[in-house]
């Protein structure tokens, strides 16, 4: 009786971890959209460096390599973004 209970509880843990992965994926897509707006807004007088640091912290907190890679790819343009980056949607 207890062995069957243990097996069923292990199955529940696997299903929970799968649902957490799906929610992480949906969170990463929304974070990538916000990251695009941060990259476009760099150099518009809103503190490009501050935006880069905020994006990095957000990527690390979500724990997905996709966001961290995207942030690292855009850090150079955020830090050196000129006024011609303003108004990007």
From Swiss-Prot:
**Domain of life, source organism:** Eukaryota
Q: Which family does it belong to?
A: Belongs to the hssA/B family.
Q: Which PANTHER family match?
A: HSSA/B-LIKE PROTEIN 17-RELATED, HSSA_B-LIKE PROTEIN 17-RELATED
- Signal sequence, start to end: none
Q: What is this protein called?
A: HssA/B-like protein 20
Q: Which cysteines are joined by disulfide bonds?
A: none
